Amino acid sequence: MTNYAIILAAGKGTRMTSDLPKVLHKVSGLTMLEHVFRSVKAINPEKAVTVIGHKSEMVRAVLADQSAFVHQTEQLGTGHAVMMAETQLEGLEGHTLVIAGDTPLITGESLKSLIDFHVNHKNVATILTATAQDPFGYGRIVRNKDGEVIKIVEQKDANEYEQQLKEINTGTYVFDNKRLFEALKCITTNNAQGEYYLTDVVAIFRANKEKVGAYILRDFNESLGVNDRVALATAETVMRQRITQKHMVNGVTFQNPETVYIESDVEIAPDVLIEGNVTLKGRTHIGSGTVLTNGTYIVDSEIGDNCVVTNSMIESSVLAAGVTVGPYAHLRPGTTLDREVHIGNFVEVKGSHIGEKTKAGHLTYIGNAQVGSSVNVGAGTITVNYDGQNKYETVIGDHAFIGSNSTLIAPLEVGDNALTAAGSTISKTVPADSIVIGGSRQVTKEGYAKRLAHHPSGSK
């Protein structure tokens, strides 16, 4: 059995009120088109053809070499869009799935079941349908007294009886590939919209006494086509629920799943605890036994086993096992923390590697630095890495002790076991095992404060 796929992605999406093509709006971190394409891959298509139109280069870039593309210059209806794919699929033996690129909730399992139903029933066409409590706006499935599908009628063309029908067309179909393109040559624009309806091929097949069937979705949510921001929000809600439920089944604990945002490509190991208002985005991996507390935001990062991240932001960083971060810390892109590192409150790290068991507990900036293991970085320490034009590196050796309020002016190297005194400004190499005092010498003038305005006896 050879399968093909046609994805309809040419529309502008006027009701989205956006410069972005409709299918490129995101749901849980992926464009709607990407969600659809991932589901389509479940049927293992020999060839996938994406019909593009509005801002076609932007749409093409999302799938790149994963699909063939055809261009629909004018949007003259779904039938016309499928006609555009004829140059890619004409004459091929097999079954062709036709699906809209704005249906992000459709699952691969449902598409595979649709194909299997189509093949097992030897249909020339099979419609994916659903039962709607409120079918207004959808095309209706019209059956005869024997339950056979005889036609699909659009909302604007439906009579009073047809408008009462609850079974609706989801806009997804499977066809015998050759018969599809033969039937498309016979459809017209004689309808309320003045468009080429793909659904008109059903009546053509029926007139030729060819078998048309319908496979009914179990989950109505999968039929959602996103045409505006309201539907986009609905899709986001459903997808978020799916994602959190998947992780819970796999052993992740959520204290308040309704407030958590987790994107589609995030991986979470068992025995992770996630509190409320946590955001996990991009290609993030969370290791087993890790705890993410309220307000944590992580994107494109790898978090090792048994870490604790407390109300902090982590971007494009790698944390080994046993690391603790926060509260209110910020790990910026290019940060790597080895085992059991502690990054405390109001500490910012960027583009740096920090060795195991090193601690930076408070109010510190570490940028463009290589920090060894078992280093203590005192409160208020700053690596001065930028001169207005270039960034420079700071290297701190193993077991060094950086005193509070040290200012380390890069390029700079502090050797193993070295110590900087509190309040020092360091601009030259500190040899291993050395103590450096870089602050100004204290001068005390007894009684002088009485002459200053702040003193009770001072001048006013």
Curated annotation (Swiss-Prot):
Acetyl-CoA binds at A379, N385, Y386, S404, A422. It comes from the Bacteria. This is Bifunctional protein GlmU. Binds 1 Mg(2+) ion per subunit. It is found in: Cytoplasm. Residues 1-229 are annotated as: Pyrophosphorylase. The active site is at H362. Catalyzes the last two sequential reactions in the de novo biosynthetic pathway for UDP-N-acetylglucosamine (UDP-GlcNAc). The C-terminal domain catalyzes the transfer of acetyl group from acetyl coenzyme A to glucosamine-1-phosphate (GlcN-1-P) to produce N-acetylglucosamine-1-phosphate (GlcNAc-1-P), which is converted into UDP-GlcNAc by the transfer of uridine 5-monophosphate (from uridine 5-triphosphate), a reaction catalyzed by the N-terminal domain. Residues 230-250 are annotated as: Linker. The keyword Cell wall biogenesis/degradation applies. It comes from Streptococcus pyogenes serotype M4 (strain MGAS10750).
